[in-house]
Design a protein with these regions (language model features):
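Terminal low-complexity tails and localization/encapsulation signals of metabolic enzymes
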Residues: 1-30, 63, 67
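Glycine-rich loop-to-alpha-helix module at the N-terminal edge of alpha/beta enzyme cores
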Residues: 28-112
Length: 112
């Protein structure tokens, strides 16, 4: 898994840590623990990008968020399954949480 920093996917130099399914304690994968420098680079890139996003017209922002909503809906079951495995939730709980995430994006598009 890579970090997305400054518009680019960057390989992490951090050590790999286990992803454990809390429902059965099985290791389901590994992810790098990003370093402090990587975190700082991501924060710096976000701060640098903010003025441009701030000047982005509301309609353009809504289009970006609407695309996010579409992608979340297209991958609804996959997102729900990932939550179930990574958080030990039932699939129904995960589906509810995924649906709430989609609703939050919908609210954000209405606010803009």
């Amino acid at each position: 898994m890579k970090n997305f920093i400054g518009g680019e996917w960057v390989e992490s130099k951090g050590e790999l840590v286990d992803i454990v399914n809390p429902a059965n304690q099985k290791v389901i994968g590994k992810v790098p623990m990003s370093t402090k420098d990587e975190l700082n680079a991501a924060v710096d890139a976000a701060r640098e990008a903010f003025p441009s996003w701030r000047r982005t017209p509301p309609l353009s922002r809504v289009r970006v968020l609407f695309r996010l909503k579409e992608l979340m809906e297209e991958h609804f079951e996959e997102l729900s399954r990932i939550q179930t495995v990574e958080h030990g939730k039932t699939i129904d709980e995960s589906r509810g949480e995924t649906r709430r995430g989609i609703e939050n994006v919908e609210v954000a598009t209405d606010v803009l």
